[in-house]
């Protein structure tokens, strides 16, 4: 039997190892957007969420990538070759949209849109049942570039550590999969990234 802990940050992973955990059973990738030091990656995530087209989304994902890769890399490093199950982003996107006027203004300026357009885009994200809405695997299907970026961050982090002779054992969890076709779609993206 293997007993694992959960972790939300590299520091959590180190603490889990100190406690004797035999791996991380759930590393929620989106928790890098909460807490200390999260302001810049959260801002890039917000840019990605509010992007109006593929080019805007790709630019935001490219800005977000180094933050995500670093968090994953340091978590894998902390676990010293023990398994780390990394769950791809799961929460509904509207949870990450700023609610205070100062942050809304900053985001609108970065996107080169006015406050009304930001509000329109934000309203379009609201759902009547967020638990069953546009999140998890469904987000990855409608925007495969989001899954691709996360998979690339995980795999590059592991490869960089391997080149430093640090053993890693990353595992990828695809959240909220309800049908085989959903799983197959996301699995193909991850495997394509792995061989590229």
Regions of interest found by a model, annotated:
Residues 4-196:
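Conserved alpha/beta-domain cores
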């Amino acid at each position: 039997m293997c007993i694992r802990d959960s972790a939300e940050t590299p520091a959590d992973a180190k603490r889990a190892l100190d406690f004797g955990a035999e791996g991380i059973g759930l590393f929620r990738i989106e928790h890098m957007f909460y807490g200390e030091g999260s302001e810049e990656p959260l801002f890039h995530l917000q840019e990605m969420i509010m992007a109006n087209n593929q080019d805007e989304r790709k630019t935001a994902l490219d800005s977000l990538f180094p933050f995500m890769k670093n968090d994953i890399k340091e978590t894998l490093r902390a676990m010293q070759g023990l398994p780390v199950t990394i769950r791809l982003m799961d929460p509904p996107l509207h949870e990450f949209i700023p609610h205070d006027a100062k942050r809304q203004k900053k985001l609108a300026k970065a996107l080169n849109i006015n406050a009304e357009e930001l509000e329109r885009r934000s309203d379009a994200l609201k759902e009547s049942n967020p638990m069953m809405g546009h999140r998890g695997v469904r987000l990855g299907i409608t925007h495969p570039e989001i899954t691709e970026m996360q998979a690339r961050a995980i795999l590059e982090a592991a490869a960089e550590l391997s080149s430093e002779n640090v053993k890693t054992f990353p595992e990828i969890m695809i959240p909220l999969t309800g049908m085989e076709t959903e799983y197959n779609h996301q699995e193909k993206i991850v495997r394509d990234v792995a061989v590229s």
